[in-house]
Amino acid sequence: MHKIFSKNNLIFFVFGAFIFVMIVLQFFVSSENATKVNLSQTFEPISWLHLLGTDDYGRDLFTRIIIGARSTLFVTVLTLIAIVVIGVTLGLFAGYKKGWIERLVLRFIDVGLSIPEFIIVIALASFFQPSLWNLVISITIIKWMNYTRLTRSIVNSEMNKPYIKMAQLFHVPTRTILIRHLTPKIIPAIIVLMVVDFGKIILYISSLSFIGLGSQPPTPEWGAMLQQGRDFISSHPIMLIAPASVIAITILIFNLTGDALRDRLLKQRGEYDESH
């Protein structure tokens, strides 16, 4: 048990250090250097001046990755906020109100989740003009369903408990029950799902930008940088390896953090399996 939580604490430390480093680095790089073309410095090798070299337009790769993190992570956070607001709200009402509202939401979710998420996201993104903002809409349209289903499940398990029955008996307003009594019960599970989905959404955004449905040049974004580096994989592989590595490391950190949060949540509930 001690080893399990020592491992989790290490993961939390790495997660915090990663976020801290990404924030601090934003103050040491200029967004102008990430887009400014300098044809006299194309394909510069790795050096102290250019930590990852330069690309085919003479732009510093390290700077573009750091500024690209701003675009990728900001859009990911914005997408998660939209997903949580929509998903949790629908889940609360579906679980509390029951009746036709619950049946309608559940049937819609059953249909939506029967199709692979990424296929739907690609189909939706292809209808919009390529941009990061349209990716927010496309991903939100499909991802809210998981949050609605999770929220409804938790609400259903809470509805038969004495504190909810007493609140209803004393005619406590529905809004008060939903916000003050039920919402705190779902927050831990929602946070775990958000952290796990953070990595998935980064992958979606990067993948869609890679195939031309997301960020457009010259905006630095990790997926768009992958698309650009693909053309130089033989002559200058660092242009592909650098953004791919950052994407992989970021997703891994968020996935491990999500697993650690889930383990801690289960431990608090007394459901943790030590053989896990």
Curated annotation (Swiss-Prot):
It is found in: Cell membrane. Keywords: Cell membrane, Ion transport, Membrane, Nickel, Nickel transport, Transmembrane, Transmembrane helix, Transport. Disulfide bonds: none annotated. It is a multi-pass membrane protein. The keyword Cell membrane applies. InterPro entries: ABC_transport_permease, BP-dependent_transpt_permease, MetI-like, MetI-like_sf. Residues 69-258 form the ABC transmembrane type-1 domain. The chain crosses the membrane at residues 10-30, 73-93, 108-128, 186-206, 238-258. GO terms for cellular component: plasma membrane. PANTHER family: D,D-DIPEPTIDE TRANSPORT SYSTEM PERMEASE PROTEIN DDPC-RELATED (PTHR43386:SF1), OLIGOPEPTIDE TRANSPORT SYSTEM PERMEASE PROTEIN APPC (PTHR43386). The complex is composed of two ATP-binding proteins (NikD and NikE), two transmembrane proteins (NikB and NikC) and a solute-binding protein (NikA). Part of the ABC transporter complex NikABCDE (Opp2) involved in nickel import. Probably responsible for the translocation of the substrate across the membrane. Belongs to the binding-protein-dependent transport system permease family. OppBC subfamily. This is Nickel import system permease protein NikC. The gene is nikC.
